[in-house]
Amino acid sequence: MDFAEFQIDWDRERRTGVPEAIFSQGKTAAQIGAIVAAAADRRLLLTRLSAVAHETLAPEVRDALDYDPLSATAVLGGGIPLAASGIGIVAAGTSDLPVAREAARTLAFAGHRTEIIADVGVAGLWRLTARIDTLRQFRILIAVAGMEGALFSVLAGLVEAPVVAVPTSVGYGVAEGGRAALHSALASCAPGLVVVNIDNGFGAAAAALKMLRAGRERP
């Protein structure tokens, strides 16, 4: 393969605070294999690598990757020790866990331990309020929800920490593949809510990393 087809941005984490990641969707098995080979002894995060695409990779490429089918992420180069981050991830429903896991795996790749609090959507509000003392201990919260996305405003109205909203494509009918949840997040009456694109767990993790880094490095 002509290596001009891709250029890995190894300097990205130093420059921006967010590690380089390979968006695997749309790439061929040969392209992914060449990227993994080019990474050699370095660490690399791959996102949106479906189980079907993972199975098409050459055996030696698959063997080199720590693959998580739920989040469709893979890590080359193994894990690193995780430090407490103060970042919590709140998933409205079990069906939102793939996106929540993408955020968690991205943060783990960057060396940050997170906690996922799952199935606390507002259809059973007691599930959320029962965990409110725990939620208020986090420095940053990532909220993941589909359907109507009501979790975003409710959570952001209960905690001091910044909340990053991730609408998911979970739902049907007028949920419109996550658009209803996205519009709900954007129209939220809870001030300070940060919103990323539909199903963008990686983007939410990137926002959290920047917040964390800014809080540590600046007075």
For the regions a language model picked out, list residue spans one by one:
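C-terminal binding/interaction regions
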Residues: 91, 135-136, 140, 170, ...
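Short glycine/serine/threonine-rich phosphate/pyrophosphate-binding segments
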Residues: 32, 96-101, 125, 145-155, ...
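Glycine-rich phosphate/diphosphate-binding loop of Rossmann-like nucleotide-binding domains
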Residues: 84-126
